[in-house]
UniProtKB/Swiss-Prot annotation:
The keyword Lipid metabolism applies. The modification N6-succinyllysine is found at K63. The record marks G56, N89 as: Transition state stabilizer. The lineage of its organism: Eukaryota, Metazoa, Chordata, Craniata, Vertebrata. This is Isoamyl acetate-hydrolyzing esterase 1 homolog. The keyword Lipid metabolism applies. The active site is at S24, D197, H200. Belongs to the 'GDSL' lipolytic enzyme family. IAH1 subfamily. Keywords: Hydrolase, Lipid degradation, Lipid metabolism. InterPro entries: GDSL (IPR001087), Iah1-like (IPR045136), SGNH_hydro_sf (IPR036514).
Length: 249
């Protein structure tokens, strides 16, 4: 069969999508050993993992761009799961970083608005995972700030308030949530090894996030089939019998 004949006889393959929406911790997640890369590897031939991370962004800006990323009427192209991972920038100290700072009440409202928007475009709450910001290692981050010629512009206690707000939004909206801020500090452990500069994730921190996120995500994608048959199961003499239409799975 020619390629044109094959195109006419086979149904289109719809590749399910997992959307990662967040700030720099999401943007950097596709670096070597990043948590997004680990997810993509785990979901090979089941889902495409899309990185929609925007370094430096807060929920005020995220709320504006979300409708440009996921449009109403996408139907079958809608993600099977969405992570919303903001707060590291919203929680900056207003006096030191007014551009990125978002007041706590507005942060909560923005998260809630984004979950409600997803519902309005047929992505139900069961597909959504909120992720709290990780804890801040102030000593390490202060060194980074000094190198940039500024004062310490974040405090872990403030980040914790935003993490609590994220948890409350998840409870109110009925979404899953990963409380990264609490988990990384469980039993008063030294969490500095999870962070590369006091704020962003180290290789160990990426593994930690993946390990705790996967069970939540797996619930949403476990029923999805592996796309196309294993090579050992492809019909040898007439491969199109295996590779077109109902043989996709």
């Amino acid at each position: 069969m020619s390629l044109c004949e094959l195109a006419a006889s086979g149904s289109s393959l719809l590749w399910p999508r997992v959307l990662l929406f967040g700030d720099s911790i999401t943007q950097f997640s596709f670096q070597q050993g990043g948590w997004g890369t680990l997810l993509a590897d785990r979901l090979v031939r089941k889902c495409d993992v899309l990185n929609r991370g925007f370094s430096g962004y807060n929920t005020r800006w995220a709320k504006i761009i979300l409708p440009r990323i996921i449009r109403k009427g996408a139907g079958l192209e809608n993600p099977v799961a969405v992570t919303i991972f903001f707060g590291a920038n919203d929680s900056t100290l207003k006096d030191e970083n007014p551009k990125q700072h978002v007041p706590l009440d507005e942060y909560s409202a923005n998260l809630r608005d984004m979950v409600q928007y997803l519902r309005s475009v047929d992505i139900p709450k069961e597909r959504v995972i909120l992720i709290t910001p990780p804890p801040l290692c102030e000593a390490a981050w202060e060194k980074e700030c000094i190198l940039k010629g500024c004062k310490l512009n974040r405090l872990n206690v403030a980040v914790g308030e935003y993490a609590k707000a994220c948890l409350q939004v998840a409870r109110d909206c009925g979404t899953d949530v990963l409380d990264l801020w609490t988990l990384m500090q469980k039993d008063n452990q030294d969490f500095s090894s999870y962070l590369s500069d006091g704020l962003h994730l180290s290789p160990l921190g990426n593994e930690f996030l993946f390990f705790h996120l996967w069970p939540l995500l797996d619930k949403k994608v476990s029923s999805l089939p592996r796309l196309l048959p294993d090579w050992k199961d492809v019909e040898e003499t007439k491969p199109e019998l295996s590779l077109l239409g109902d043989g996709d799975h």
